Amino acid sequence: MDAIRGEVSDKIPIRLVIGIASRALFDLDESHRVFVDEGVEAYHAYQVARENEVLQPGVAFALVRKLLALNQRIGEAGRVEIILLSRNSSDTGLRVFNSIRHHKLDITRAAFTGGASPYRYVGAFDAHLFLSADPSDVRQALAAGC
């Protein structure tokens, strides 16, 4: 294997696919508090009203930025792919994608589960790793063999 280029001898490219929860990528503590304290309807209204407010980086943001930078450093796009796996619905997830665009993160694929744990989508995206700020989601992903 050529460690620099990330290829095996028959030239099959190796790609690292990482699924990340929106709460790990961005600081969603305040909106999560609204969800827990006030319920789904209030959370929906909160996110939609703030869809153009940029979210601040979360606990895994710096790691994601560095992983995505490997694509430019190696000289070939697509060696590392980050996939957003989110409990948001597609409409409340708009704020997350607006923030992804603002921070210039090369994240183009996502699954919005509408409240369900996103770990179920790790395998569907052939992700090698799942990053989440929710310990329960991580445990479920590990138990499922993800």
Q: What label would you give each PLM region?
A:
Residues 1-146:
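HAD-like aspartate-dependent phosphatase fold
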